[in-house]
Swiss-Prot record:
Its EC number is 2.7.2.3. Substrate binds at D21, L22, N23, R36, H59, L60, G61, R62, R113, R146. It comes from the Bacteria. It catalyses: (2R)-3-phosphoglycerate + ATP = (2R)-3-phospho-glyceroyl phosphate + ADP. PANTHER family: PHOSPHOGLYCERATE KINASE (PTHR11406), PHOSPHOGLYCERATE KINASE 1, CHLOROPLASTIC-RELATED (PTHR11406:SF23). Pathway: Carbohydrate degradation; glycolysis; pyruvate from D-glyceraldehyde 3-phosphate: step 2/5. GO terms for molecular function: ADP binding; ATP binding; phosphoglycerate kinase activity. GO terms for biological process: gluconeogenesis; glycolytic process. Belongs to the phosphoglycerate kinase family. It comes from Klebsiella pneumoniae (strain 342). This is Phosphoglycerate kinase.
Length: 387
């Protein structure tokens, strides 16, 4: 993958426009989870250290496009950055007709979604963004799968368009896991729906030596083996698709599970064989035997790609399966890469972040890259590198 990297450029005195992913949860004007800002800080600090005139922007939430809405302002992000950086930081609301930035100063440009045409990759808006800078740095892997004015359009018109350190690291890590993985390679696909991850399962079945399914996805495979899944979340119309996958690749289907008669945090967990599920029960976690079987597979893996939990780990009574699997990944000596919001929440809960080789900041972009789809922002950077 050939792109210009920000780390290869001299940024001194240059106007640098960084598109970061600062889309963080905010409550009462305060950032409640700073993982994405923390991940972006090294890029911002590197540009400031080089004496660049630095602008950074992002989207935050889903405001009505083209309208300012205080609820979705980047002000809480600015306040967070002021605490972390020794450089001056200020928020600018109206910047499309130009903005003055001093060398060594950080200007945060207000939420890009307040600009009409952002999501449609509007050419006139893209050109206005491009006119603000000498160097455009795309560093938001989480939005690289969307062709929008601040992630894609600007890059076509900026004098220089490059990949930031975070984006470059994401692409390197995913390339390492998918292009030439150390073997055996194990891929875990969990979460609730087969339909949204079917193409991912299909793509991975061609790369991975071992495919593991968990969560609601696994329930569809349990049903495909002819078991009653009661009130469990599963997709009846995809049972045949699950059967096809089972016939073409080795997928361990749970043999024991934890069930409940209601979907709630206080529901009682009952451990039982998949042969004994009643009509009023729903599968909410893997059983100990099934979870341990997966842990044994993971122990010997040289590459692990993890997307999605294997049970409703948010409920303490249905956490054990995901915990066993998470700890097995943490203890593995292989290269592990994890992505997706629920996966990151599980990593935080079990305190294993330092034991995962690479944690991807992208959800949708992570999955689309795994599927082998072209990410528009990355394709644009490759195109610009050829010019």
């Amino acid at each position: 993958m050939s792109v210009i990297k920000m780390t290869d450029l001299d940024l001194a005195g240059k106007r640098v426009f960084i598109r970061a992913d600062l889309n963080v949860p905010v409550k009462d004007g305060k950032v409640t989870s700073d993982a994405r800002i923390r991940a972006s800080l090294p890029t911002i600090e590197l540009a400031l250290k080089q004496g660049a005139k630095v602008m950074v922007t992002s989207h935050l939430g889903r405001p009505t496009e083209g309208e300012y809405n205080e609820e979705f302002s980047l002000l809480p992000v600015v306040n967070y950055l002021k605490d972390k950086l020794s450089n001056p930081v200020r928020l600018v609301k109206d910047y499309l007709d130009g903005v003055e930035v001093a060398a060594g100063e950080l200007v945060v440009l207000e939420n890009v979604r307040f600009n009409k045409g952002e999501k449609k990759d509007d050419e006139a808006l893209s050109k206005k963004y491009a006119a603000l800078c000498d160097v455009f740095v795309m560093d938001a892997f989480g939005t690289a799968h969307r062709a929008q004015a601040s992630t894609h359009g600007i890059g076509k018109f900026a004098d220089v368009a490059c990949a930031g350190p975070l984006l470059a690291a994401e692409l390197d890590a995913l390339g390492k896991a998918l292009k030439e993985p150390a073997r055996p390679m194990v891929a875990i696909v969990g979460g609730s729906k087969v339909s949204t991850k079917l193409t991912v399962l299909d793509s991975l079945s061609k790369i991975a030596d071992q495919l593991i399914v968990g969560g609601g996805i696994a329930n569809t495979f349990v049903a495909a083996q002819g078991h009653n899944v009661g009130k469990s979340l599963y997709e009846a119309d995809l049972v045949d698709e699950a059967k096809r996958l089972l016939s073409t690749c080795d997928i361990p289907v749970p043999t024991d599970v934890r069930v409940a008669t209601e979907f709630s945090e206080t529901a009682t967990a009952t451990l039982k064989s998949v042969n004994d599920i009643k009509d009023d029960e729903q599968i909410l976690d893997l059983g100990d035997v099934s979870a341990q079987k997966l842990a044994d597979i993971l122990k010997n893996a040289k590459t692990i790609l993890w997307n999605g939990p294997v049970g409703v780990f948010e409920f303490p009574n249905f956490r054990k399966g995901t915990e066993i699997v998470a700890n097995a990944i943490a203890d593995s000596e292989g290269f592990s890469i994890a992505g997706g919001g629920d996966t990151l929440a599980a990593i935080d809960l079990f305190g294993i972040a330092d034991k995962i080789s690479y944690i991807s900041t992208g959800g949708g972009a992570f999955l689309e890259f795994v599927e082998g789809k072209v990410l528009p922002a990355v394709a644009m950077l490759e195109e610009r590198a050829k010019q």
